[in-house]
Amino acid sequence: LIEMGVSVLRGVGLGALVAVFIAGLVVGYYVALHVAGPGVQQPAAPEGGVFFLPDSAYYGNLTYYLDRANKSVYVVMYVVKYDPRYPDDPVNKLLRKLVDLYKKGVDVRVVVDDQTLISYPDTINYLVQNGVPVKLDESKSVTTHAKIVIIDGKYVFIGSHNWTESALTKNHETTLLVDSTKLAEEVTNYFESIWSSGRPPA
């Protein structure tokens, strides 16, 4: 039986075996990525790598990278819903992470749409009271509907997830995580353009 196996391997050829092995790795990785359960943390993407984060997979990955942030975190979000009644609300946890990072000296800045100020003023109050710089976009006539997080000038989360409990745990939402300093620079420039023309929330 062993001799038969060796003969088969010889017949297939090393190149074909390597190709099959690599194909197996790719298929295995794809399956693991796309059937991962809610909140599953994927390993860091290679430079230029892209991860698809559907539904609640976004939250686990975002917290993974926020926990490792040491330089900067820039957030642009249409709606951020802080709810002081529920400490374990996933949005509350994200905001606490931002506050903790800011107090450690990380450059944390947040831009939200007026809808956050109107519907969820506790969000603004919590961030401002803890010193985190927050701005609204340049005019009430402008809607900031983007949902972006840029971490350490390298990791970009961009997609449909607002920071609400529903978006993070229930809704069908999609976001891409891109590991690219080049893209991060472009998106940071976009963030800075909104930030520089933004309004204080008070």
Please report, for each region that a protein language model flagged, where it lies by residue.
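Short, surface-exposed coil-to-beta transition loops
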Residues: 142-146, 170-172
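Secretory targeting signatures
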Residues: 1-39
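Primarily the HKD phosphodiesterase
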Residues: 65-132
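Solvent-exposed loop/turn segments at secondary-structure junctions
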Residues: 79-83, 114-118, 139-143, 155-156, ...
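Short acidic active-site motifs
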Residues: 61
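N-terminal, intrinsically disordered, polar/charged segments of Gram-positive cell-envelope systems
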Residues: 37-50
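Short, flexible loop segments at the rims of nucleotide/cofactor-binding pockets, characterized by
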Residues: 49-55, 85-87, 134-136
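Signature of lipid phosphatidyltransferase scaffolds
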Residues: 151, 155-202
